[in-house]
From Swiss-Prot:
Signal peptide: none annotated. It comes from Burkholderia lata (strain ATCC 17760 / DSM 23089 / LMG 22485 / NCIMB 9086 / R18194 / 383). The keyword RNA-binding applies. Belongs to the NusB family. The lineage of its organism: Bacteria, Pseudomonadati, Pseudomonadota, Betaproteobacteria, Burkholderiales. This is Transcription antitermination protein NusB. InterPro entries: NusB-like_sf (IPR035926), NusB_fam (IPR011605), NusB_RsmB_TIM44 (IPR006027). Keywords: RNA-binding, Transcription, Transcription antitermination, Transcription regulation. The keyword Transcription applies. It comes from the Bacteria.
Amino acid sequence: MKKSARRQSRELATQGLYQWLLSNASSGEIDAQLRGALGYDKADKELLEAILHGVIREHATLVEALTPSLDRPIEQLSPVERAVLLIATFELTHHVETPYRVIINEAVELAKTFGGSDGYKYVNGVLDKLAAKLRPAETQARRNG
């Protein structure tokens, strides 16, 4: 199945944030490396840039929003889970035009692609809690049918 440009952007953002979490390289360095990555030409570059630079710029705020939904300190999560959760938190707060279920489903797929065997289940549970806090009207409307 062919990946959408938005999915490709999220995959590249996950790879870039993983690298940033491990190396603390600048967003410019990571951006330059991603430009040479497989699939870059098929990505939605505007979305990729918004996510990558937005998550790095707002890291502390995103961690603060995410932490109450975690069952352990964020430092104990794998770098892949952290990157995926940070991307989803950024999208939940900044891309309100994207339905929360789409954001969660994309995050689960990223965790399946890049993470450990059951990491996607954890990501799903955390984001369900977080979406209820960040988008209460939208999540309640969905639950009420």
